């Protein structure tokens, strides 16, 4: 993959861009195998990967420059703005959208936020595309509601220029910190969820719900989890840290008793919408803390699926899972180091199967799926 900003040393987000892609995969696989070297793994599966470029479905753009000539991208360490509208990680459909958004910022008078001066209103633009429909979700992250009426007044022009904009919202992030979004979200369109489909499973993306940024590899990850779980012939499972329900909805059939737990109410609303559309009747989704939910339950499912954030599931949940002793644990991780630590705490389980999914080409990061079986 070629990138002008990387070549000019203006952006180094893709730390491994100079490394041939086959070597990237080999290095990630070696890293994973070294982390699990103290454990016996019955079956290592080959890494799964997708496109090397144009694979992201989401752009997080810092807005800088002036209201007349806004710049979308990132800020260099010295505060210099870097335009990322031509970033090769984004699909080609994004560049013309960014061009229209720059014009819209000027028309609406949305003054870009100046970090050094702590002045201005528009901090970020967050753009997400559905690979299923081609529709877009756009979020304006503002410092306050000062420019909200101006934005709303100019919005019909933007919608005319970009009819694929299905979901538009404003997020208020008032603090002068490197935080992407605040708690307050205000919808500007009647439609509030972006539809997506992976492997014939309908999924929905709301403004404040997490969704994987590499749809091609994410679909493969979900399909693999479904295959592994279906082979186990289970009839009850928990999906902890379930997000919008991608894993559980793939793994469950009409007879499976599925309980999905996620702290984000927005994500749970998406999961419930998907379950309704699939006609699943034995499914429950709840907006709760996954660890608190699990440790308060007395019934034991046959399988517990966990997909935690980078910190892992932690000692408390590991201890409880060991006591609860479900027959199977399916662990999906975006941080193999914390996963390895967690697995070490699950001493009564053996690792049946492991597979790496390269969700983040040109970086050291990757996803990994591990199936654990009670000894």
Swiss-Prot record:
It catalyses: uridine(747) in 23S rRNA + S-adenosyl-L-methionine = 5-methyluridine(747) in 23S rRNA + S-adenosyl-L-homocysteine + H(+). It comes from the Bacteria. The keyword Metal-binding applies. [4Fe-4S] cluster binds at residues 3, 11, 14, 87. CDD domains: AdoMet_MTases. Its EC number is 2.1.1.189. Pfam families: tRNA_U5-meth_tr. The keyword Metal-binding applies. One of its GO terms (biological process) is rRNA base methylation. GO terms for molecular function: 4 iron, 4 sulfur cluster binding; iron ion binding; rRNA (uridine-C5-)-methyltransferase activity. Keywords: 4Fe-4S, Iron, Iron-sulfur, Metal-binding, Methyltransferase, rRNA processing, S-adenosyl-L-methionine, Transferase. S-adenosyl-L-methionine binds at residues 212, 241, 262, 307. The active site is at 334 (nucleophile). HAMAP family: 23SrRNA_methyltr_RlmC. Belongs to the class I-like SAM-binding methyltransferase superfamily. RNA M5U methyltransferase family. RlmC subfamily. PANTHER family: RNA M5U METHYLTRANSFERASE, TRNA (URACIL(54)-C(5))-METHYLTRANSFERASE. Catalyzes the formation of 5-methyl-uridine at position 747 (m5U747) in 23S rRNA. This is 23S rRNA (uracil(747)-C(5))-methyltransferase RlmC. It comes from Yersinia enterocolitica serotype O:8 / biotype 1B (strain NCTC 13174 / 8081). The lineage of its organism: Bacteria, Pseudomonadati, Pseudomonadota, Gammaproteobacteria, Enterobacterales.
């Amino acid at each position: 993959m070629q990138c002008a900003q990387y070549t000019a040393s203006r952006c180094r987000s893709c730390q491994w861009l100079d490394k041939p892609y086959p070597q990237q995969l080999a290095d990630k696989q070696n890293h994973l195998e070294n982390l699990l070297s103290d454990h016996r793994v019955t079956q290592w599966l080959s890494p799964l990967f997708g496109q090397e470029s144009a694979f992201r479905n989401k752009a997080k753009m810092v807005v800088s420059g002036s209201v007349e000539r806004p710049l979308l991208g990132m800020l260099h360490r010295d505060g210099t703005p870097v335009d990322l509208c031509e970033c090769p990680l984004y699909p080609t459909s994004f560049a013309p959208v960014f061009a229209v958004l720059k014009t819209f910022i000027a028309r609406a008078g949305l003054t870009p936020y100046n970090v050094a001066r702590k002045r201005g209103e528009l901090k970020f633009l967050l753009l997400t595309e559905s690979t299923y429909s081609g529709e877009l979700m756009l979020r304006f992250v503002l410092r306050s509601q000062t420019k909200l009426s101006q934005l709303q007044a100019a919005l019909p022009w933007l919608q005319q220029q970009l009819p694929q904009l299905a979901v538009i919202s404003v997020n208020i992030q008032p603090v002068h910190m490197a935080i992407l979004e605040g708690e307050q979200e205000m919808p500007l369109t009647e439609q509030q969820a972006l539809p997506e489909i992976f492997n014939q499973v309908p999924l929905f993306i709301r403004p404040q719900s997490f969704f994987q940024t590499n749809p091609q590899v994410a679909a493969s990850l979900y399909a693999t989890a479904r295959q592994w779980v279906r082979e186990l012939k289970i009839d009850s499972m928990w999906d902890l840290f379930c997000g919008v329900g991608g894993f559980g909805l793939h793994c469950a059939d009409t007879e499976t008793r599925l309980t999905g737990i996620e702290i984000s109410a927005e994500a749970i609303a998406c999961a419930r919408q998907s379950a309704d559309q699939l006609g699943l009747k034995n499914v429950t989704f709840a907006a709760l803390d996954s660890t608190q939910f699990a440790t308060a339950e007395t019934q034991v499912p046959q399988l517990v699926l966990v997909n935690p954030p980078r910190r892992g599931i932690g000692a408390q949940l590991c201890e409880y899972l060991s006591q609860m002793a479900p027959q199977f644990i399916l662990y999906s991780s975006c941080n193999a180091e914390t996963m390895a630590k967690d697995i070490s705490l699950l001493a009564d389980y053996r690792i049946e199967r492991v597979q790496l999914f390269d969700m983040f080409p040109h970086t050291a990061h990757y996803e990994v799926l591990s199936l654990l079986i009670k000894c």
